[in-house]
A protein has these predicted regions:
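Active-site anion/phosphate-binding pocket segments in diverse small-molecule metabolic enzymes
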Residues: 1-140
Length: 140
């Protein structure tokens, strides 16, 4: 964090979560993402999340970084698609993440600064790119 954050008690004001659309097991050799950008070296459990680059999620984060769930980082797998992205949930217990659950894409565990480093950009761009398709909830 920049110097301004160390002298003020500034709290994060933005959190982005993505809803799990589906989970599935994929065997070794299966392709994942647009053009099968990734081939599973071994069997994996994957979750498709309903956020993509049309929502302002940076494509530069394809295969770097990840989402957070219950304190664990779930690595992105393959390319960020227009309407979805995929995370590896193999490290979670089999029924820990189900369709309808939410993962943290931006928030206390995945800060704008971290996303900017992963995506070779700046934290202001991460926030500015967030699109109108994302549901907004204002809290006091």
């Amino acid at each position: 964090r920049g110097a301004g954050f160390t002298i003020c008690d500034v709290q994060p004001v933005v959190e982005v979560t993505g809803r799990v659309i589906q989970t599935r097991a994929v065997p070794a050799g299966a392709g994942v993402g647009y053009g099968w950008a990734v081939t599973a070296a071994e069997g994996m459990r994957l979750a498709t999340i309903g956020v993509g680059y049309a929502d302002g999620w940076p494509r530069q984060l394809s295969a770097v970084g990840g989402a957070a769930f219950e304190g664990r980082l779930l690595p992105f797998v393959g390319r960020i698609s227009m309407d979805s992205l995929v995370v590896d949930v193999s490290a979670l217990p089999p029924d820990a993440l189900k369709p309808g659950d939410h993962v943290e894409l931006l928030g206390p565990n995945r800060t704008p600064e971290q996303l900017a480093l992963d995506g070779a950009t700046i934290d202001y761009e991460v926030i500015a790119r967030l699109g109108r398709r994302l549901c907004r909830e204002y809290v006091s």
